Amino acid sequence: MALLVVILQAITLLATVIGSRSGGCDGGMKKVILSLALGTFGLGMAEFGTMGVLTELAHNVGISIPAAGHMISYYALGVVVGAPIIALFSSRYSLKHILLFLVALCVIGNAMFTLSSSYLMLAIGRLVSGFPHGAFFGVGAIVLSKIIKPGKVTAAVAGMVSGMTVANLLGIPLGTYLSQEFSWRYTFLLIAVFNIAVMASVYFWVPDIRDEAKGNLREQFHFLRSPAPWLIFAATMFGNAGVFAWFSYVKPYMMFISGFSETAMTFIMMLVGLGMVLGNMLSGRISGRYSPLRIAAVTDFIIVLALLMLFFCGGMKTTSLIFAFICCAGLFALSAPLQILLLQNAKGGELLGAAGGQIAFNLGSAVGAYCGGMMLTLGLAYNYVALPAALLSFAAMSSLLLYGRYKRQQAADTPVLAKPLG
């Protein structure tokens, strides 16, 4: 219970500190950012919580550990399927009502998963839990773009994302502890109950506003005619794939390449979790001075260098810890600026664009894990997973550079007379 209080205090502090960089935030706006941060914390717990309870889940339900691992994939499938469906068929409702519906799905999905006693029911529970994930980030970003003054939205979105980073740092260890001491069901029961509290915060703190930019179903797809959103989708997918090609194998890498003991992995995972928190915080802090494009492109470049160092210097314990920290910090430093770039390039279909970003993110996780696994299938050492990881992150950076070139060319082709006079 004490750890749960610490977690809630951490979310409140981070959301307030990062969100306050959005400038001109009154108490009401800070409560909106906090409410959305609580929502992303619940999503982070649900998405990654199964990783710490696989053994207990398999033994309790009577399935194999690989079959229990399928629950991670079912959640990702729910994200991929649910995000566009919700985005396309929610235009008649206010953004607040959409958020309430999404959090209600989180409650239902995690409650189903908690009470399941068969593989089929577990899978359905995970699918339902994943359905609202992408749309929540999209709707949350749109809400913030409407109540925060232009140029400060990136910091506000980073405040929203801070909940996800706290889930990685503190929430998942709490879930693992509950599973080991009591039952894995306690972990997901806690997530379901927590999301009821999130619903209350959305109801009382989020204003009832509409996305007036929505048109008919066909008009929501018009933004996809431009190469700009596709380049951002590519940057999102390749950027996440790059980090996950290495991070998916972080435990054997640290044990067999860097020489850490298995007992040290708890400290290492908390260290990289701290990197995620600080990376997201730094991204929000500098958003007032640099454009989202510059932040994202430079971050991808730093990740490429860090991954190359993990390949060449993995045998040095201190070095491997430093660059593991940098990689995971970079992963969440990318989140807010890429979300803003998608909103800027999805006029008329903002929710669909933001949902597409979450699809790209989850596809990146799958692509990255597969590419890293290929190195192991070839019989290479664990440090070789950092090579395809660096290549994928370089592809992400290249996509952003191509996007920047396209936008500059587009601006150059715009007639000067088209600019407003005065």
Language-model segments: residues:
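Helix-to-loop junctions at the C-terminal end of transmembrane segments
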Residues: 83-94, 279-291, 376-377
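Helix-breaking motifs and short loop linkers at transmembrane-helix boundaries and internal kinks
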Residues: 62, 94, 115-121, 259, ...
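C-terminal transmembrane helical hairpin of 12-TM major facilitator-type secondary transporters
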Residues: 294-338
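A late C-terminal transmembrane helix in Major Facilitator Superfamily
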Residues: 345-381, 389
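Helix-loop-helix hairpin linking two adjacent transmembrane segments in secondary transporters
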Residues: 150-151, 155-204, 249, 253
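Paired small-residue
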Residues: 109, 120-128, 318-326
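Cytoplasmic helix-loop-helix junction between adjacent transmembrane helices
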Residues: 125-163
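Conserved MFS/SLC helix-loop-helix module at the cytosolic interface between two early adjacent transmembrane helices
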Residues: 81-117
